[in-house]
Each structure stands twice: as structure tokens, then as C-alpha cells.
Amino acid sequence: MSSMTPRETVNALDNHIIGQQKAKRAVAIALRNRWRRMQLPEEMRAEVTPKNILMIGPTGVGKTEIARRLAKLANAPFIKIEATKFTEVGYVGRDVESIIRDLVEMAIKMLREQETAKLRHKAEDAAEDRILDVLLPPARGGDPELEDNSTRQTFRKKLREGQLDDKEIDIDVADSPMGVEIMTPPGMEEMTSQLQNLFSSFGSQKTKKRKMKVKDAFRQVRDEEAAKLVNEEELKARAVEAVEQNGIVFLDEIDKVAKSSERSGGEVSREGVQRDLLPLVEGCTVSTKYGMIKTDHILFIASGAFHLSKPSDLIPELQGRLPIRVELDALTVDDFKRILVEPSMSLTKQYVALAKTEHINLNFTEEGIHRIAEIAFQVNERTENIGARRLHTVLERLLEEVSYSASDMPNDQTVDITAAYVDEQLGEIAENEDLSQYIL
């Protein structure tokens, strides 16, 4: 669990997301409150539930990115799902409990990667020994100790230096059992898991001799050895705890399941999805193949643009489960300028790095960046407002010629992206509303 203070969390988010300080503060406080809860006595800890958040703002202003970066900072299991994917129980489609099942799968994957990284050196040593056993089978009647100290060490050195990478060897590797996909109704995942385990056990522990290059064999054997070292039962128990105590669910498009006075039809199903979400957000127990998961302390961050509906159109019970409301601001020209330059991996830095691979120096001037920001803002105002995503479209169109011709240009040529260059490439399209609707 992250022990970052709210100020540290906001500063870390500032490296990737421009503006939206209110939203950053809200999620930073929510993250810190988790740490505070874990410092409380056991009996009080169970009573303190997370204060779920509702983010309100147009598309492309940073709602999803804030939640995604927060989960990375917290090193917490995180899942982003669209509320529109789900249907009311009784209708054909996914039921909302699959959110928690997917979250547990994410936690298992995350913890397995962490555990494998920790055991990497042990697994590599074991893989080296298995490959050396193939390269240097012990001689009959020879002294294995003597061999180990001389020839084996020479070969180990060659193996580590990559001198044997392209040598082909015959090695016994695990024979992966045939995958069996079983379709079952929602809620029957436990039975599916048991059946799949039964089928896979028929082919488990089998090895197969295969001819492979040393570098490929090393990679496969290392993964096999790492899998042997990971304690699966402990991993599952830790994943369940991580989900229950630190899980974050990002519910996008929540406004699309809200009632609206302007829409008619389909309201029953929409309200049904909200009612199904209620117990999940409030706290219930969900059955998964890894055990029962309590959702009482999972943090839910809901978001929506609320163009055609208002937060008050959500059913009152769900409104009550989302006590923290944060409005995100629409982006201005200055915001666009900052987005182009300030983030640690900003779009301009990405394009400069991509051009560098072709030995081209791409130079964005200050007035060029200002003009790009202006065009992105103008097109958003005149057509559909898609927020910062508009910059991707504008930059791709702007640098299309450079991207196409870069490999034909002389090495170390500098291309200056000035305001004049931007107008030359985009001016006509940006001014013509009909064209910009289709191209930008």
C-alpha cells in the first residue's frame, strides 16, 4: 500500500496530467484515507468505508487518466469498465459481479509479475543449470566435481555472454496441455475453473523434447523455473486481500445508465443496471474462483460527461453511495499548450524521439506550439469537443509529411515546427469547418 501524502500524490499526478487540481486532490485524499484506515485498531477499521467519487466532466479532460495513474502510484489492483457494457440480471449480457471477478484476475496477474521479478535471479540460475546439463552431459565414470569446476564454468561464462545463443540443443520442456474453453452462465466460474483444472491435470507434468536455440530454450526454461518457485496458494490469498483492501474500480460512462427526460425507452434496463451496481458499491460478497470477495472497502470512482442527463438523474440510492462530487474543467488554449510540453512523456517529446530514430531533429518552437494549441481548441469549439484527444489528430496531420519522408531525408536534418509551418500544413483545414469535421 502506498504511504504517499496527498501533496506527494498530487505532485506525482502533475507529471502526467495538466490542471484538474480539484479532481487530483479528491483522489489523493481518498488514497491517503486508505493508509489512515490501516493504522486504526481492527474493530474500527472494519467500520471505516471508502468515500466513493463521482467525476463530472467532458470527454478527454483527464478523468480516466487520473484514475489509471492513481492505481499505478498506489500499486493497487485496478480495473476500468464502461457501465454501458452491463445489463440487468435476467437480460442477456454481462452481470455487474463480473467486475469483481475481473479485478481479482488483474490482482493475480499483477502479483504474479511482481513475484516472478523477485525470483528472476533464482530462476535464471536454475535455467542455466538445466541448459548446461544438456550441453555438458556428465561423462561416464568421470569426476563430476572436477568437470563442474572447469569446463562447466567455461560454458557458463559463454552462456552468460551470449556466445551460445544461436546453438541448437534438444531439451525437455513442459508440454503445454491443450486449452479447453468452457462456456458457463455468469456466477458458475468456480465450476468452470474446476473443470478446466481437471482437463489440464491430464496433461500436467508431461515434458516433451524439443529442438530449440539456446536463447529461446533459456527463456522458456527460466519461465518454467519461475513458475515452480511461485507459491500459488499464497499468491491467491494475497490477491484476495489486495482486492478487498486496495482495489480500485473505475466506472466510466455512468451517465449513460442514468434516466433522462430527453430519452425514452430502455429506461427499465438502465435503472436495473444502477440497482445491480448498488450492493457492489455499498458492500457485498461476490463469489469468485479464488474465494469470496467482500467489496466493502473497494474504492469506486464513477465518471461521466452528463451531457444529456444530470447526476441527480441517477437513482437516489446510488447518488448516496457516491458522496464526493468533482467537476473537471473544460480545456483552454493554455491547457493545450501545457499538455504539449509539460508532462514527462508529452506528445511533443514522443514525436521528437520518434524522429530521432531516423536521425531527424524535430524542433517545436514556442509560437508553433501555441498555434497547434489554438487550432486544437478552435476545432473542439466548432465541432465535437473531444478534449486533449484532439491533439493526437492535429499532430498526426501536422507531421504526416515528415513521418512519410523522414527515411529519405539526409541525416541530422532539422525540421522546425513554427507557426508558419503549422498554418501551411493545417491552416486551410482548420479554417474550413466542413473539412475539419472530417479530417481533424
From Swiss-Prot:
| Classification via Pfam families | AAA, AAA_2
**What would be one Gene Ontology cellular-component term for the protein?**
HslUV protease complex
User: Mainly localized where?
Assistant: cytoplasm
What residue range is the signal peptide? none
What are the BP-aspect GO terms? protein unfolding; proteolysis involved in protein catabolic process
One Gene Ontology term of the molecular function aspect: ATP hydrolysis activity
Q: Which UniProt keywords apply?
A: ATP-binding, Chaperone, Cytoplasm, Nucleotide-binding, Stress response
Q: Does the keyword ATP-binding apply?
A: yes
Residues that, per the record, bind ATP: 18, 60-65, 252, 317, 389
Q: What Gene3D superfamilies would the database entry show?
A: 1.10.8.60, DNA helicase RuvA subunit, C-terminal domain, P-loop containing nucleotide triphosphate hydrolases
Q: Where in the cell is it found?
A: Cytoplasm
PANTHER family from the UniProt entry: ATP-DEPENDENT CLP PROTEASE ATP-BINDING SUBUNIT CLPX-LIKE, MITOCHONDRIAL-RELATED, ATP-DEPENDENT PROTEASE ATPASE SUBUNIT HSLU
Q: How does it assemble?
A: A double ring-shaped homohexamer of HslV is capped on each side by a ring-shaped HslU homohexamer. The assembly of the HslU/HslV complex is dependent on binding of ATP.
Q: Which family does it belong to?
A: Belongs to the ClpX chaperone family. HslU subfamily.
Reported function: ATPase subunit of a proteasome-like degradation complex; this subunit has chaperone activity. The binding of ATP and its subsequent hydrolysis by HslU are essential for unfolding of protein substrates subsequently hydrolyzed by HslV. HslU recognizes the N-terminal part of its protein substrates and unfolds these before they are guided to HslV for hydrolysis.
In terms of NCBIfam families, this protein maps to:
hslU, PRK05201.1
Q: What is this protein called?
A: ATP-dependent protease ATPase subunit HslU
Q: Please report the organism this UniProt entry assigns to the protein.
A: Marinomonas sp. (strain MWYL1)
Q: What is the lineage of its organism?
A: Bacteria, Pseudomonadati, Pseudomonadota, Gammaproteobacteria, Oceanospirillales
Give me the gene this protein comes from. Answer: hslU
